[in-house]
């Protein structure tokens, strides 16, 4: 409009000059042709200006700016080019100025009408243009920065899952905004700069106006004439891309799979083989079960086979090393009446409690495989009822356990305490060890077959009983030893009942022994134990400790651990030397009942002597250093009856016995340093008594016995043959044997200054009958302070000897 005003002003000025200067009529006629040309030029200029304005308006609607032509330059160039003509025809133009003004007005009206028509045409033509853009040019939208929005949005949807969720949510909100005719703008919440950039680009993609609020953190979008909804949603692009990617990945995975290659190769090599992938779930489960059963069955079979293989290997070793006892078998844990095998409750270490001569099964806990002569094993009766066997390596390293560990069943504990016996031997080549199993039981059960007692090797022709020494003083002459279970007396090898007939010279010496024991009341009587009554014989015996026939094993459940001095024995023992073990005694021990004839005899032994009684109850009290352990239910009374009358059945009435008080210290512990012990099984070639196994106290542990406030106990192991009943050969005075020649007092010297016994020694008497050839019999006193052990009569020729060692040993 400013340009038109300038033109009008110029025309008005020209008209003014024409009015002032009057011209002749012929001049006016000459210039009419020129005036028409000028009018045409003016019309062309106005039309060009109008078109430029229309273009600028339409470009502003599209967001583009176009520069209009410079009119001043053309207007300035026109007067310069036509200056000559103007000067020549000024008078003509001035004459026709009035007509020109009228024409200009009509032209302006026409131009305004044309402008209005053009605007209406532009408005009607914009709608089809938008439709054409949404259909044909949807892929051609670009941002103000020149970024292709379609490509940017597709890449963002593919690559970033977080941006994908933002774009999908934003798309839904914008579509809802466009569909809502009531709202003309929408304000997004405050967000980060990256998210605002996404909003700007999505709004531009939808043809919306997008700006930022005053804070600069929120985007406001407005509807425009170019607002559109794209035909293809964002989720459609995702579906297409996901389908393509998944197909590509699947193909690559199939091609690059090494498992599939191996399967394909195997299938090519074996075309009739079923493919691994074609197996169903049921087939896979069946195959898994088969493999599982095979594996676990193999383990159980191997564990059981290893036990028997090792047992057989040990048996072969013992047969090779000991040629004189090739036919003797290793004792394994018997199966109980229910046919229960030893695999369920029996560990492999319990079956490994057997060793061959000079060769013990190697244990993984051995620190030195060459150290075979180890210290005694120790059986521990813990509160849980298990029995652990520990083997000492040497006298100095008491903390190193190199033996097997053996544990009995959990049912072996009882209120009175469980008890067991140790079985550890290392015999030389000349003899077979007496090994007893670990046994512990609760009342009313037979635990030895169930707990799996370790293997025992013993001569088949001898067995041993440990009896208190006090029984020798309380048994009246002419008494017969009866079997408490059968009621039958023990018989000699010739079939005659075994009659106990001590010599007359033993009576005064017996009283002398009692006198010596009474000379030390402070050490014998300071801590008396409660009196223990006689337990009735139980029908079941627990823990056979000697390998004999079944009737023997079920009746006598004792074992002894003999202790051998380390180097002070006057004569090397004929039996093997082994470490002995110290076993805490349970609350009760096997009781020995002596029924005398009618005569009154004083209470013998080394405990405090009580009033004269006709019957004596000899029951060892608990002791921490026990060599014989018997479960509480396995009470085994031994009855002595005078000669001439004895019961022949188990219905014979037995009188109750009077209790005898014993002194023992349960809390005393036995030192493990430098303890040597010896199992001395006696080699026999004849029936009858084969010998005596004794226990000798080493000088290192003598102070333990002497320091205890009780009476040191000497025990003797009496051997008896395996016959229909226990045969204890006794002698009678009527046989006319020169008994005084076989009875020699044996002094038991103790170390001076220890205060338990006088240094002069303690006499021990032997009453032995000579029906059978002589054998090596050893009578060795142990360190057990619980009770005393009688010297039983043995059927062999004797030579009594004395020892100067701590402890005592008798050789026959």
Swiss-Prot record:
The modification Phosphoserine is found at residues 33, 56, 134, 300, 363, 383, 562. PROSITE patterns: R3H, SUZ. Residues 40-53, 102-130, 351-360 have a biased composition (Basic and acidic residues). Interacts with CALM1. Gene3D superfamilies: R3H-like domain (3.30.1370.50). Residues 361-373, 582-602 have a biased composition (Polar residues). The keyword Membrane does not apply. This is cAMP-regulated phosphoprotein 21. The keyword Coiled coil applies. Isoform 2 may act as a competitive inhibitor of calmodulin-dependent enzymes such as calcineurin in neurons. Keywords: Acetylation, Calmodulin-binding, Coiled coil, Cytoplasm, Methylation, Phosphoprotein. SMART domains: R3H (SM00393). Phosphorylation at Ser-56 favors interaction with CALM1. Signal peptide: none annotated. Residues 1-130, 246-281, 332-436, 485-544, 561-632 are annotated as: Disordered. Residues 228-300 form the SUZ domain. Residues 32-58 form a coiled coil. It is found in: Cytoplasm. One of its GO terms (cellular component) is cytoplasm. CDD domains: R3H_encore_like. Isoform 2 is expressed in brain. Isoform 1 is present in immature thymocytes (at protein level). Residues 164-227 form the R3H domain. It comes from the Eukaryota. The modification Asymmetric dimethylarginine is found at residue 655. It comes from Homo sapiens (Human).
